Design a protein with these regions (language model features):
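Strand-connecting loop/turn motifs
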Residues: 113, 148, 302-304, 336-340, ...
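Hydrophobic, well-ordered secondary-structure elements that form the walls
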Residues: 21, 104, 153, 234, ...
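Flexible, solvent-exposed coil segments and beta strand-coil junctions
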Residues: 83-84, 119, 270-276, 300-306, ...
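Long, His/Glu/Asp-enriched segments that create or flank divalent metal/ion-associated functional microenvironments
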Residues: 163-236
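Outer-membrane beta-barrel initiation region
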Residues: 204-206, 224-226, 235-338, 359-368, ...
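C-terminal outer-membrane beta-barrel translocator/porin domains of Gram-negative envelope proteins
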Residues: 281, 340-348, 357-361, 378-380, ...
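Beta-strand secondary-structure signal
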Residues: 181-185, 197-199, 222-224, 233-235, ...
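Hydrophobic alpha-helical and helix-loop surface patches within well-folded domains
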Residues: 1-185, 193, 206
Length: 464
C-alpha cells in the first residue's frame, strides 16, 4: 500500500489513484475472505440459512459484470479522459475505479504475480515522494517485463474496445507416441486483443495449460499444440480473469451450476450457466391441485429463461384425462449488435388461459449530470385465446390480440408514461384503440442541518 507516497493529478488521471486502490482492496479482501471478497460468515452481512444454502458471487466477477454492463451500454468512455469531462457519474465511477482495477487484474494475469508485483515495486521505488502519470507506470511495467505493452494500455486507457474471444471449432488427432495434437480455431468477435490461456481438460479430470500469443491484430487463428492425453474439453481463460464480455463461447462445454431458487439470491458467475429449480403448484375446482416444477436458466444480464411444467391430480370430467400445463418465458440481450435492445418472449398454456407475447425493449440512458431523464421504449404484441371460464374467472371469454407501444421517461423527480395499444383484427373479439398518459411527481426532502446548510450556501461542509 503506497498512497500518500506517490502523488498524482486526480483531475487529469483519476485512475492512477482510485484504480490501484480498488484493485488492491479487492485483492486483499479476496485473499482475506476467499473469492467472495467479504466477511460472509458474519451475522452483520448474512443470515444463517444464507450461509448454509446460498451460492455467493465471486468479488472479481461482480466487478466484471458491472463494467460489462457499462461498456455494452453504448455510453462507454475511455479511462484516460479528464475527470471533469466524463458525461455522468456512472462514467466517472467506472473509469476511475472499476475499469482500471480490472485492467490491472488483466495485467497481473498476463505477467504473472511475480512480474506484476515487481513492476509495482519498481514504480513505487523510482517515484516515491514524486508525482506519477500513465507513462511512468507503463515504463516500469515494460522495464521489468522486458516487453512492450502499448497494445495493452492503448486499448484500455485511450479507447473503448470490447473483447470477446470464442472457440469456433476444434478437433484432435492421435500422434504415434500416444499423445494428441489439438487443432483449435480461435476467433475474436470484438476488437480488443489479448493473449489467451488455453486449458485442456481430460476425461480423468486432469488439465494442461498453454498460452496462445498470436493475438496482435489477429481476429482469427488456428492454434495447433500437443497434449499428453485425449482431450475432453477446451477452455479459453479458464479462471475468468479477463474482461471477455461473454464466456458462453469460451469453452467447448461451459460448466453448469444447479441450485434451488432461493428468494433474494442473485448468483451470477462469469464462467457458468446457472440452473435454478423451484416447486410450482396450481389449484382450481376442476383439476384440483396441479403440482409441478419451475426451472430457470440464466447467464448474467444476457440470458434469462423460465420453464414451468404442471400436471393435474384429477382428470377433467369431460375429456376424462389429466391436464398438462406449461409456461415458457425468455429474455435475451445481444452482445455485439443491437446492444441497447432486449428481446422478450412469453408463451403458455395455463389453467383457463393460453397466450403468446413478443416484446422488444430499448433503454436510453442520459448522457450528462441530470441533464436528461432515462427513457425506455417497448414495442410488442400479444395474442390470447378463448378463456376457459371453468378454470378461471379473472378474464372475460373471447379471443384478444393487440399491438402496443409504451414509452417511459423517468428522472429523479418525475415519471411520464405514454401507452398506445390497438386490437388486431380478426384475431380479437374486441376492437379498440387506446392512448393514455400518466405523469408522476416525486421528490423526497429531508431537513437535517447539513442539507439546509448545503441548500443555503451551495457547498458541503466536512466534519471531523
Amino acid at each position: 500500500w503506497f498512497y500518500g507516497i506517490l502523488g498524482n493529478n486526480e483531475l487529469d488521471e483519476a485512475w492512477i489513484d482510485e484504480g490501484f486502490t480498488t484493485a488492491q482492496t479487492r485483492d486483499y479482501m479476496m485473499d482475506r475472505y476467499g473469492t467472495i471478497g467479504f466477511d460472509w460468515q458474519s451475522d452483520e452481512w448474512t443470515d444463517k440459512y444464507q450461509r448454509k444454502f446460498w451460492s455467493f458471487n465471486n468479488k472479481l466477477h461482480n466487478d466484471q459484470w458491472s463494467s460489462i454492463n457499462y461498456i455494452l451500454s453504448g455510453y462507454d468512455e475511455p479511462i484516460s479522459r479528464k475527470s471533469y469531462l466524463f458525461k455522468n457519474s456512472t462514467s466517472y465511477r467506472q473509469n476511475a475505479y472499476t475499469k482500471p482495477s480490472l485492467m490491472l487484474n488483466e495485467l497481473k494475469y498476463i505477467l504473472g504475480d511475480s512480474l506484476y508485483y515487481l513492476s509495482i515495486q519498481d514504480f513505487y521505488k523510482k517515484w516515491e515522494l514524486k508525482h506519477v502519470d500513465e507513462e511512468k507506470f507503463i515504463e516500469s511495467v515494460e522495464k521489468v517485463s522486458g516487453k512492450e505493452f502499448d497494445w495493452f494500455f492503448d486499448a484500455w486507457l485511450h479507447d473503448t474496445r470490447v473483447m470477446d474471444y470464442s472457440i469456433q471449432k476444434w478437433h484432435a488427432k492421435k500422434n504415434n507416441d500416444g499423445t494428441y495434437k489439438v487443432f483449435l480455431k480461435i476467433k475474436n468477435l470484438g476488437n480488443r486483443h489479448m493473449p489467451q490461456l488455453v486449458e485442456t481438460e481430460f476425461f480423468d479430470g486432469s488439465t494442461e495449460r498453454i498460452w496462445w500469443e498470436n493475438n496482435y491484430w489477429n481476429n482469427e487463428d488456428e492454434f495447433i499444440f500437443d497434449v499428453s492425453k485425449k482431450p475432453a474439453r477446451l477452455s479459453l481463460d479458464p479462471d475468468a480473469q479477463s474482461l471477455d464480455v461473454d464466456y458462453r463461447n469460451n469453452s467447448t462445454k461451459l460448466k453448469r451450476k444447479i441450485t434451488f431458487d432461493w428468494p433474494g439470491m442473485n448468483y451470477k458467475p462469469r464462467d457458468k450457466i446457472v440452473y435454478t429449480w423451484l416447486p410450482s403448484l396450481y389449484y382450481n375446482n376442476i383439476d384440483s391441485y396441479s403440482p409441478g416444477l419451475q426451472i430457470r436458466r440464466s447467464y448474467g444480464s444476457f440470458e434469462n429463461q423460465i420453464v414451468k411444467l404442471n400436471h393435474s391430480l384429477e382428470k377433467d370430467p369431460v375429456y376424462k384425462k389429466h391436464s398438462f400445463y406449461w409456461y415458457y418465458e425468455g429474455s435475451f440481450k445481444p452482445v455485439h449488435n443491437y446492444r441497447s435492445f432486449e428481446f422478450n418472449f412469453k408463451v403458455f398454456d395455463q389453467p383457463g388461459l393460453k397466450s403468446l407475447k413478443f416484446e422488444v425493449n430499448k433503454t436510453k440512458f442520459p448522457n450528462g449530470y441530470r441533464s436528461k431523464p432515462k427513457q425506455n421504449y417497448k414495442l410488442g404484441f400479444y395474442v390470447q385465446s378463448n378463456v376457459d371460464t371453468k378454470r378461471t374467472n379473472l378474464f372475460e371469454p373471447g379471443k384478444l390480440s393487440s399491438i402496443y407501444f409504451n414509452h417511459l421517461m423517468k428522472s429523479n423527480y418525475f415519471e411520464f408514461e405514454t401507452d398506445i395499444s390497438n386490437s388486431i383484427s380478426p384475431f380479437s373479439r374486441w376492437d379498440f384503440s387506446k392512448i393514455s398518459f400518466t405523469i408522476k411527481f416525486k421528490q423526497a426532502k429531508s431537513f437535517n442541518s447539513e442539507n439546509v446548510f448545503r441548500y443555503l450556501t451551495g457547498f458541503t461542509h466536512a466534519g471531523i
